[in-house]
Amino acid sequence: MRLKSKIREKKQKPKPTSTDLKIMEWRYNQFLGEKMTYKEIKKDPTNQTFLVTDIKFALDSSHIIVGDKGGRIIIFKNTQYKGENNLEYYFEYLAQDKDFDVHKSIEYTEEIKALDIFPNYNYSNIDILSASYRTIKLDRVYEDKTNIFEDMNKNNLSIPKLNSVKSEIKVKNKKTLTCEKFYEINSLNLNKFVTNNFLSSDDFRVYLWDINSKNSAVYNPIDIEVESNSLFNLEKITKSKYSNFNPHIFFYGTNKGVIKLCDLRSNSEQIKLETNFKDEKSNIKNSIGNQLSSVHDICTSFSNQNFVASRHYFNINLWDIRKQNEPVSKYLIFEPAINKLTYLYHNNYLNDKFSIDCDSSGKYILTGGYNNMFHVFDIEQRLNTQIVIDEKNDQLMNTNIIRKINSKGSCYYKKDDDDLNLINFDQKITKHAFCPNSNFLVIVVYNCIYTYHGNLGKKVG
């Protein structure tokens, strides 16, 4: 007589179908700043100094820093309120000053071109990197505590008693870095693994720096000035960033639409460019085509080592570093505006630069657009969530316009052509930040910031 086995086969869990998947819904949460309209900014030039030029989360998401055209840096604390992120004003200071080049007789403004913040391992200190046109500064914001005692030995000898502790937030400059060969600085990025190292880039060079080094840049691995010194090959570096998955790898993009992966381990003295990412199917080669293909920004994921995303004027390209000849996916940003290309060119709107951010998993990508609209792309479900920021209409600010993206990367409807003339190209979102460890967005509109929380809502289908 055979005994029946008591071991039962494990039932495999069914794979989630499209109807089981849920959509991330983004809800407006907080507003910070003093509202200004585009007309007020255009009318009074002094208002332009308050325009935000860069924004960055700390790696541990404890703080967020904001830089503006006036050289100021504003620090916000990221606190928890009812289980959600909430920003609180902490401190602000003047980080950059005007600079004058004696040899070229050129005055450079104090505008913050790029910034970054060190992880806050010492909770009493906040170390911040900021760059103007030609100067990089390392500042430390700290809390200075002073003990205040009662009047000692006023009448008779006694042990002094502590009355109170006076706390004051101060800032001091720890280091100022300059380089004679500097062109206009366009990038500043910390190494996520070796936090005393960072990189910067200008039009023709990428510099690697060490905070602890007494000298200037450790070395200059990328120099394309000689290659670009031609009337027919005016290639310039537009953005550079360390990867979020390897301390030895960084990327830089150019105005020709090329993204290059650089591995610091390939050569101890001179970098070897191992990978070129360029969309070979792009057949636009005129000056307007270069502006459209120019790399505005680059982002990488902490978890997916093969994932690289780049923002261009009309689209986002998703790259797999194992496939170099073309992007694996392309997402179009407001496709109908291509029909107004001549208008955009003659009004200099093609010079607008848009940022790109992604969450730690690389599942969601955040970018801005015109008409005060920002987009959150769901990579897995191929969805484009569009939200318009309108301070006069709270209901509109909480309205998630969700569109399915087709195989060509488009979520275009014919009715969009009717709305094209209603788009205000002066109202644009170019700067934003994605919290490193939660579904929390910070969106910049002129001199104000708006925050959004993401929660899984209704199912797809």
Pin down the residues of each PLM region.
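Conserved beta-strand element within WD40/beta-propeller blades
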Residues: 64-67, 127-132, 197-201, 250-253, ...
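Loop/turn-rich, solvent-exposed surfaces of beta-rich toroidal or solenoidal domains
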Residues: 301-318, 322, 345-400
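Blade-level signature of beta-propeller repeat domains, shared across WD40, Kelch, NHL, RCC1
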Residues: 430-461
